[in-house]
């Protein structure tokens, strides 16, 4: 299965390594037409106001929204911001793939970034992981159909709704594979089971 990584900003290589560990084929997405040859998409970290400009200029908003109707999307850090319903910053145009509102750079400057242990309720069990937060966004509101998979300092930091998954931290920096596995294996399997059952 080919999984695309939006290659406008962020660390493409670390996400590629995670996908390869799961026997998934990573491919870089630089143009909207690239979405036609993948079965899932990662929106990696970066700078959300810059990502807004780059995505707008390339015509990604309509293309990703259409793609996300039937395919899983995983967003990390700024990727979560782009997937959110509202970013509380008028400079940022979001995709509205997750019914959450976020506050950007809630954890401060990059020098204050931290790695902390988290317990994640995912794939039917609770799992401990290390999570690296870098100028991380804070989820300040979750809609009724959003599942909270992990919290940090009382706020959700990993959420799932339908086929989509948003994280305020960077699992790829710690070699954590469970979120990529959940998004691109478990959720895809559930989607296929529903299609066959219909």
Protein language model annotation of sequence segments:
Residues 1-57, 63-66, 72, 177-181, ...:
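N-terminal beta1-alpha1 cap of cysteine-dependent amidohydrolase-like domains
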Residues 104-198:
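Amide-donor transfer/coupling interface in amidating biosynthetic enzymes
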Residues 48-119:
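Cysteine-nucleophile active-site neighborhood
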Residues 2-4, 94, 163:
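Residues that mark the start of a beta-strand
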Residues 38, 69-71, 92-93, 128-129, ...:
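Short coil/turn connectors at secondary-structure junctions
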Residues 12, 35, 82, 89, ...:
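Flexible, glycine-rich phosphate/dinucleotide-binding loops
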Residues 8, 76-78, 98, 135, ...:
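A secondary-structure boundary/capping signal
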Residues 43, 75, 167:
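Redox-cofactor binding/interface segments in oxidoreductases and associated redox assembly factors
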């Amino acid at each position: 299965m080919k999984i695309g990584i939006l290659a406008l900003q962020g660390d493409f290589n670390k996400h590629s390594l995670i996908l390869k560990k799961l026997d998934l084929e990573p491919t870089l997405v630089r143009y909207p037409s690239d979405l036609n040859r993948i079965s899932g998409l990662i929106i990696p970290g970066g700078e959300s106001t810059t990502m807004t400009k780059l995505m707008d200029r390339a015509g990604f908003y309509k293309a990703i929204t259409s793609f996300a109707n039937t395919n899983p999307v995983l967003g990390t850090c700024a990727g979560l911001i782009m997937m959110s319903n509202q970013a509380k910053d008028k400079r940022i145009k979001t995709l509205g793939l997750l019914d959450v509102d976020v506050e950007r750079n809630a954890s401060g400057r990059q020098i204050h970034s931290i790695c902390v242990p988290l317990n994640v309720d995912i794939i039917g069990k609770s799992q401990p992981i290390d999570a690296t937060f870098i100028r991380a966004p804070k989820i300040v509101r979750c809609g009724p159909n959003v599942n909270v998979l992990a919290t940090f300092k009382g706020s959700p930091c990993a959420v799932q709704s339908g086929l989509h998954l948003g994280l305020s931290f960077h699992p790829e920096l710690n070699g954590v594979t469970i979120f990529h596995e959940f998004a691109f294996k478990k959720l895809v399997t559930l989607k296929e089971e529903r299609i066959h059952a219909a």
